[in-house]
Amino acid sequence: MTRSLAALCLSLLLGTAWAQQPIRILVGFPVGGTIDTVARLLADQMKDDLGAAVVVDSRPGAGGQIAAQALRQSAPDGRTLLLSPDHTMVMLPLTVKAPGFQPLSDFAPVGQVARYPGGLAVSKAAPVSNLAEFFAWAKANPAQANVGIPAPGSIPQFFVFTLARQAKAPLSSVPYRGSAPLVQDLLGGQIAAGTTALGDFVEHHAGGKLRVIAVLDQRRSPLLPEVPTFLEQGYKVDWEYWLGMFAPAGTPQAAIERVNAALGRALARPDVRERMQRIVFEPAHGTPAALGEKIRQGTAYWEPVVREAGWVLQ
């Protein structure tokens, strides 16, 4: 009874504090990008539920590192949140010498927001339509077997390493500064192939400007039902990209639970689901504990790959 009363009092105090000042959602990626779009959609839907203005605070750069550091330095009062992809929470601590944060000790998971597939696409001029043809072509043309990735040290880079090892193909990663320039070079034929979030390819695939030859997910995408997964084509790569919400460590549990509940209600709205699915994000609400477990599982999955690839901490 005492614990319940204390929780109720804290909840009332939090409600008063939130009504007086806005809640910030930090985003470490460019304005207008898919993660920024999701953040603004959630901010608009959650404000009434939380009884306060919710604003998106854009802190782009360094693969989300700048925004994550800003969260670490924020007060744990429930008014500063971070919308982050798996890259920031899993890969940065594995590939950067001093990321400035440790996900499981500096942050409090609030809940998963979405899952989304990846894809491997080839230029329109590439004479391939599936993985078997792509790897045969790569072996016959090793100097051209370059695969664009959105950033050095990103999940796509180590995904390409894993794929090359399984196929025994001479694939080389070519890092870009984001998915947009990668896709532009793919459309222009400056690079033979590229891998990033599937949503960056869908429109161009539909328009015949490039070809997606494999989907990185456990099942086919309803937007590209004709394109098989890597698993269907015989390759054991089934990583699921995800997006989650975090608060600073030490944030009161009542605040975490309140934001998680508001997040869940927002993600359950048909209009929110439709708008997220339009940019190839599948709403996937979960508990704080489940999100923390995703970080642990992701670290266990990628750490040996990073080590085997001989990655030197930057």
Predicted regions and their residues:
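A ligand-binding cleft/hinge motif common to bilobed small-molecule-binding domains
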Residues: T88-K97, T162-Q166, A193-P225
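Hinge/capping helix and adjacent helix->loop/strand transition within the periplasmic-binding protein
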Residues: Q73-R79, L94-P181, W242-R275
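Beta->alpha turn/N-cap motifs
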Residues: L83-T88, I149, S179, T196-F201, ...
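Residue-level signal for nonpolar/aromatic packing positions in well-ordered secondary structure
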Residues: I23-I25, G32, A39, V56, ...
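C-terminal lobe and pocket-closing loops
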Residues: R115, F201-A268, A300
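N-terminal (or domain-start) structured segment
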Residues: W18-D106, Q144, P152, R165-T195, ...
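Bacterial N-terminal signal peptides
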Residues: S4-T16
